Amino acid sequence: MSRIGRKPIQIPDNVNVTVENRQIIVKGPKGQLSYSLPEGIGITIDNKTMLITRESDLSKQRALHGLARSLISNMVTGVSQGFTKALQIYGVGYRAQVSGNKIILNIGYSHPVEFVLPEGIKATVDEKQTTITLHGIDKQLVGQIAANLRAIRPPDAYKGKGIRYTDEVLKLKPGKTGKK
């Protein structure tokens, strides 16, 4: 049996979980998320504890068992606490600004790059305009938006200029060695 799928999910007091026709709806103080259960995967809720079960031991169902448990656990965490992802901008003159639901990036191109944030994602920029912090309740969406922002100007291998995650460690390449 999947070891991840076997773990019970604890439901906080401020989160409400309902199941209707294989559709799980999780409501909390930060918002609401829903997930459609795959075929062969079941759910039992009792006394602020959720347990995910599967009908058979087929390899596809074993894989979906752990996946469903992780996704539902992330939904519960998202609506109660939320998720954040921070990006750091490195480079002389590189900076970011937030205006409404747009992030305006000056990152070495001849024009400022405008990145439109989807609904449910908020962004903040620090005073130095070099750290972008994304906030949201959907872990997958927060991570995808962070990856899309990083892809606009990935870190350079020689100088390290560009957009990277705050916890990302770059191994810089050595430059050319001159003739003597």
Swiss-Prot record:
Keywords: Ribonucleoprotein, Ribosomal protein, RNA-binding, rRNA-binding
This protein's GO CC annotations: cytosolic large ribosomal subunit
UniProt GO MF annotations: rRNA binding; structural constituent of ribosome
SUPFAM superfamilies (alphabetical): Ribosomal protein L6
Keyword rRNA-binding carried by entry: yes
GO process annotations (BP): cytoplasmic translation
Pfam families: Ribosomal_L6 (PF00347)
Gene3D superfamilies linked: Ribosomal protein L6, alpha-beta domain
Role, per record: This protein binds to the 23S rRNA, and is important in its secondary structure. It is located near the subunit interface in the base of the L7/L12 stalk, and near the tRNA binding site of the peptidyltransferase center.
UniProt record similarity statement: Belongs to the universal ribosomal protein uL6 family.
Subunit and partners: Part of the 50S ribosomal subunit.
Protein name: Large ribosomal subunit protein uL6
Species assigned in the record: Thermodesulfovibrio yellowstonii (strain ATCC 51303 / DSM 11347 / YP87)
Gene: rplF
